A protein has these predicted regions:
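Conserved catalytic core of the tyrosine transesterase superfamily
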Residues: 1-300
């Protein structure tokens, strides 16, 4: 496909997404999906036929693509054909793959404490005396994910000005779904953040990246989380999002109203929050099995 054929289409698709105020990540993902479909097709995507979309899905399935990957391709290509090319119904032959319902991985409070204690670099206990305290930085970041139930992108994009110590709140700007919200700020977490600020004295981003003008990346945070889990010898698959899952589950096990948890997590629908009722196991463990209540039969 010639650059002359691609460039106008890509530009128009970007404009269509800009008009609809799609997030930067969504725009990148959609462009990449159309680019990969074009490479498979071997010609300009505006010359595609409905059967080509079906063949492409079959191609992805043969490669072992995940449910999320298959559905992202379907959503992006539907947008491209329906909106950018003005062909409503063109992508109807693309199947929507039903994702299996998997329970989130949740750490126990003891495992969370162990994870935080093994944040990379935390062996430097006199962190406040050091010019660089990587352990304090990552412990603060991981503590935010667990203590406030934040997504990894929300931790990465926090600014110093978002910490409202007078009201004990953290402002989350433009979280998922481009909605602002407030997260709770505990005294212990505030103390930890103040320790971090005294060491680094960040002015803009709370956790600056390698380039101070840019925030830390989500990849860096997840790597730090994986390193802490390995050092703590946890046998579960742990990521930054695991800390968010654990936050919600532990609140639910302490009988916090699920609607309050919904607000803290920034969920639009209560159904999304309700998944944690399936992993909040304290109530299940406290139930007495009917087997234990059976009386022995009278002697014959």
């Amino acid at each position: 496909m010639s650059p002359e054929a691609v460039s106008p289409l890509r530009r128009r698709m970007i404009e269509d997404m800009t008009i609809r105020q799609f997030g930067e990540k969504t725009r990148r993902d959609y462009i990449r999906q159309v680019r990969e479909f074009t490479a498979f097709l071997g010609r300009s995507p505006d010359r595609a036929e409905p059967e080509d979309l079906r063949r492409y899905q079959l191609h992805l399935a043969s490669l072992g693509a995940s449910y999320a990957r298959m559905n992202l391709a379907s959503t992006a290509l539907r947008f491209f054909f329906h909106v950018t090319l003005g062909r409503p119904g063109f992508g109807d032959r693309m199947a929507r793959i039903a994702e299996p319902e998997r329970l989130p991985v949740v750490l126990s409070p003891e495992e969370v404490a162990l994870l935080l204690a093994h944040a990379p670099g935390l062996k430097y206990r006199a962190a406040l005396l050091l010019a660089h305290a990587p352990g304090l930085k990552y412990r603060a970041a991981l503590s935010l994910a667990y203590g406030c139930g934040l997504r990894v992108s929300e931790v990465a994009n926090l600014k110093v000005a978002d910490i409202d110590s007078s009201r004990m709140l953290i402002r989350i700007e433009q979280g998922k779904g481009r909605r602002d919200r407030f997260a709770m700020l505990s005294p212990d977490l505030l103390d930890l953040l103040r320790q971090w600020w005294l060491v680094k004295r960040p002015r803009g981003w709370l956790f600056p990246g390698q380039q101070p003008a840019q925030p830390i990346t989500t990849r860096q945070l997840n790597r730090a989380c994986h390193a802490a889990a390995d050092a703590a010898k946890l046998d579960k698959r742990v990521s930054m999002h695991t800390l968010r899952h654990s936050f919600a589950t532990h609140l639910l096990e302490r009988k916090t109203d699920i609607r309050v948890i919904q607000v803290l997590l920034g969920h639009r629908k209560l159904d999304t929050t309700a998944v944690y009722t399936r992993v909040a196991l304290k109530a299940i463990r406290e139930v007495t099995s009917p087997l234990a209540l059976l009386a022995p039969p009278p002697p014959s």
